[in-house]
Amino acid sequence: MSRPIRTLLFSTLYPSSARPVHGVFVETRLRELLRTGEVETKVLAPVPWFPSTDARWGEWAKMAATPARETRNGIDVLHPRYPVVPKVGMTVAPLLLAAAAIGPLRRLQAEGFDFDLIDAHYFYPDGVAAAVLARLLRKPLAITARGTDLNLIPRHALPRRMIRWAARRADASIGVCQALVDVLRGWHIDPSHLHVMRNGVDLNRFRPLSREQARRELGLDGAPLLLSVGHLIERKGHHLVIDALQLLCARFPQARLMIVGAGEERERLAQHACRREVASRVTFAGAIANDQLACWYSAADVLVLGSSREGWANVLLESMACGTPVVATNIWGTPEVVAPHVGRLVVERSGNAIADAVQQLLASPPSRVAVRDYAEGFGWEETSKSQLSLFGQLVSAERGRDDA
């Protein structure tokens, strides 16, 4: 092409000044793609409408405080509002998203940004809405599956039918791991439209720091330290890491756990730590900006991820890029991330299984240099090249149809 490919990224999973860590993994992939200099983009990231910015409303207040348009890291981001309808919201969300987006998309075109394709992230409701928009605007469409959009939501019959419809309408369906692509293949989606493009890790942002220095900065001593990073929701398994800590204290009586993240389970997790009699050994650090996490990973002896569902868990790569080994549940794309010499996978999702795996790593830790070396095989370059190649093919095919 004589000019850069123009993409329109469409997803409700995208950060804003009001919610800077929300969907940061989508922003990261886009920023890495833009570094090639071969793509221009704008982002349409719809936000549920809410009337109040009063802090007592928590996440809803942050949504209300999200600006209608902003520039993040040099990228023009629009945040149109869409209504959330109680009880039936899950069913009608794709149409409400599409209806909220069509006006802003037309305005972008009127401003001179006539994008070549839609790059949608998360199949439901985002991907379904994007399929509607792509059909209306006659644009090629790529949808990226990221986890629960294919390993949880399809348990509901109507969303499953809509997801299948969108996958058949899409010119390309991308999975961040092979396990997600296998779901689409099982639905008999055209194999030529299926692509695995794993998430990478920013090897400059996430790099090993001196453990002693990192602990000094965080006010920690030299005791064995477990780290659990993720939203404070049940499926992330923080409660299981607390269970594991209790069991580990028999052999490692000074062991501690740092939990990084915010969410609805904060108080329940604190109560759980009290019941397990390890409350004094558990610290809730709250949400930490992505660009500050390297210090936390470097301070830890082991990162633990006790999730029940993941597509491609970015925290595992971030930790390993900092030289810190990992323990994770053996689910979905996680076996594609963790090798035996840099961590442990647990088949049984329980505190006992996690404690056994952590104990193995504490007793015989892998070299931090070896862990970092392994993570260096997961940079973004390959994924960005694959995206460029795919997007170029989609745009060329669309132009060929127009010329026919």
Regions from the PLM with identified roles:
Residues M1-T71, E398-R399:
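N-terminal subdomain of nucleotide-sugar transferases
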Residues A179, G200:
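Carbohydrate-associated surface elements
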Residues P325-A328:
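Short hydrophobic beta-strand element within catalytic cores of glycosyltransferases
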